[in-house]
Amino acid sequence: VELGCGNGRFAVSSAVRQPGWDHLAVDILPMVIRYATRRGNQRGLTNVRFLVCGGSEFLRDYFADGSIHQLHIYHPQPYREAGDEQKRLLSPEFLVLAHRRLVAGGEFYFQTDNPAYWSYFQKAVSPLFKITSTPDRWLEDPEGRTRREIVAKSQGLSIFRAVAEKVELDQSAYATYLQNAPAAEFDAMEAHPQRFANGHQVRRRQRGRRR
């Protein structure tokens, strides 16, 4: 399962490499889902499906507990504007939902180019997940890169990625986790404020100026 799949580059690539696995991917933008669906159809793939849906809603409404083997979230929107923190996907409540939906030993693949989001992820996933080493094939396979990763690399940004394995917990542990887990209230602009002005990339705005 991939949440926020964009144009489907990763999901389609994974479906090609793993024909025995079913792939489900969602995004809130109908335009990119149409493109992703066309991508899969052009390759004749029968093991990947795309849907217009929010990530939390998809996990909540379409899956039973213990039904997902891998959950992939790449470059979730950090929402840099003040007051938008509640829109961030990786809230403690979402992480509990993800933990419940994964099978025993299930894997949560996460990637971001935002240092503050990465720092929050590392703190927030414990004790629900144990971060493990990243597979070499994920690090090096250019065909599996998301569009956002390609753009970030072209801008010289660092890519932070991890695989977190589900830790088996008693149901009662969820309440304790939710009481103590950090809220997703980090400053997404703090690490590289020079890149953004009023929510837009400074570099792009400067290119548009007339000389």
Descriptions of predicted regions:
Residues 90-104:
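A short glycine-rich, Lys/Arg-flanked "PGG" loop and its adjoining helix->strand segment in the class I
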Residues 36:
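Conserved SAM-binding loop
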Residues 4-8:
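Class I SAM-dependent methyltransferase "Motif I" SAM/SAH-binding loop
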Residues 29:
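Conserved SAM/SAH-binding beta-strand->alpha-helix loop
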Residues 40-65:
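S-adenosyl-L-methionine
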Residues 133-211:
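SAM/dcSAM-binding transferase cores
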Residues 105-112:
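Conserved beta-strand signature within the Rossmann-like core of class I S-adenosyl-L-methionine
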